[in-house]
Swiss-Prot record:
GO terms for molecular function: oxidoreductase activity. This is Hydroxynaphthalene reductase-like protein Arp2. It comes from Metarhizium brunneum (strain ARSEF 3297). It comes from the Eukaryota. SUPFAM superfamilies: NAD(P)-binding Rossmann-fold domains (SSF51735).
Amino acid sequence: MASSEETPRSLAGKVALVTGAGRGIGKGIALELAKRGASLVVNYNSAEKPAQEVVDEISKTGSRAVAIKADITKVPEVSRLFQEALRHFGHLDIVVSNSGTEVFKPEEEVTEEDYDRVFNLNTRAQFFIAQHAYVHLRDGGRIVLMSSVAANMSGIPNHALYAGSKAAVEGFTRSFAVDAGHRKITVNAIAPGGVKTDMYDANAWHYVPNGKPGMPMEEIDKGLAAFCPLGRVAVPQDIGRVVAFLAHPDSEWVNGQVILLTGGSVT
């Protein structure tokens, strides 16, 4: 990953809410927004300690943060999350819907419980996060939803459930952008490829030609980096930097878009 100069505090005075911000991509997004001066609502579902560690790390950047527990698959919990965020900071400017789960399973083995678990978090929750964001954001705010490169990939076996759950989010994004435009709120989605997180550690072998369970991580990284012109796989900071741009006033003319974040990888 390229080094950078000290980051200007270009989001000073803004308040951002990031779901699933206690680890992985969500943590990377929260830290990049905080480096630029935004105050952060760090949402988590069950892992309080990692979320509080993110809050502590944000505090070291000079920005403010609070961790708020909420199960975003439950709409009353989504409502409470936004109300607590507003009570703490007074307003909201940026909402990033990051939480998600991935599953690989043969189509004939997918159960109703599998379907509900994946779509409740990856799809339904994102709809209601965006809905509440629209209601509570200040005019000129930013909504960023989470799709995946998988939504438009072909040739990945046993991935229909996950791919479908993310493809729906891309439809949400284009429609929400139209609905929110009169308030100058932009709505975009990002679609990352493989990013070095715990989800990557568990599932990335599926994307490697001839990949197998238990494959050494070094081989997985090498196999996926071979598809990327930049010669590496992504880390959460890469995704966070793009979200930080989408959160900035300079990004206003980027609206209703799904931004592929693969480093130019061809798979």
